[in-house]
């Protein structure tokens, strides 16, 4: 189970883009990969052809490629450094009814994510 979710701010902790931070655009849980904004950019060669909007030009296009989930860590909102993610159960009272909710938190600072 991936502890990284869409729209999380993550930092690359290993690989060619080590140290870069970006927002998670998409999570691929079956492949254990995440697509991070501005990280792991690759050049894609496009052939001239047609699509739904008409003809398209060929050429080179730079796009982000998915990166393995073990190579990124969630950034702590308080310290702005990579941290591990934990879960805890908190009791929330709403309209006189108490309810137990599972929340994610940064292990370094204890702040809720």
UniProtKB/Swiss-Prot annotation:
Q: Which HAMAP family match?
A: Ribosomal_uL24_B (MF_01326_B)
Which PROSITE patterns does this entry report, sorted A to Z? RIBOSOMAL_L24
Q: Which UniProt key words apply to this protein? A: Ribonucleoprotein, Ribosomal protein, RNA-binding, rRNA-binding
Q: What is the lineage of its organism?
A: Bacteria, Bacillati, Actinomycetota, Actinomycetes, Micrococcales
Q: What InterPro entries does UniProt report for this protein, alphabetically?
A: KOW, Rib_uL2_dom2, Ribosomal_uL24, Ribosomal_uL24_CS, Ribosomal_uL24_KOW, Translation_prot_SH3-like_sf
Is this entry keyworded rRNA-binding? yes
Q: What does this protein do?
A: One of two assembly initiator proteins, it binds directly to the 5'-end of the 23S rRNA, where it nucleates assembly of the 50S subunit.
Which SMART domains does this UniProt record tie to the protein? Answer: KOW
* Stretches assigned to coiled coil: none
Annotated Gene Ontology cellular components are:
ribonucleoprotein complex; ribosome
**Official protein name in the record:** Large ribosomal subunit protein uL24
Q: Which organism is it from?
A: Micrococcus luteus (strain ATCC 4698 / DSM 20030 / JCM 1464 / CCM 169 / CCUG 5858 / IAM 1056 / NBRC 3333 / NCIMB 9278 / NCTC 2665 / VKM Ac-2230)
Query: What does the entry give for GO biological process?
Result: translation
What PANTHER family does the record tag this protein with? Answer: MITOCHONDRIAL RIBOSOMAL PROTEIN L24 (PTHR12903)
Q: Which GO terms describe its molecular function?
A: rRNA binding; structural constituent of ribosome
């Amino acid at each position: 189970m991936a502890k990284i979710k869409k729209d999380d701010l993550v930092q690359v902790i290993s690989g060619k883009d080590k140290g870069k931070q970006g927002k998670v655009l998409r999570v691929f849980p079956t492949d254990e990969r995440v697509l991070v904004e501005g990280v792991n950019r690759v050049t894609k060669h496009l052939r001239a052809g047609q699509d739904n909007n008409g003809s398209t030009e060929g050429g080179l296009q730079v796009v982000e490629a998915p990166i393995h989930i073990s190579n990124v860590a969630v950034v702590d909102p308080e310290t702005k450094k990579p941290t591990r993610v934990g879960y805890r159960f908190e009791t929330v009272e709403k309209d006189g009814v108490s309810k137990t909710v599972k929340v994610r938190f940064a292990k370094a600072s204890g702040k809720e994510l």
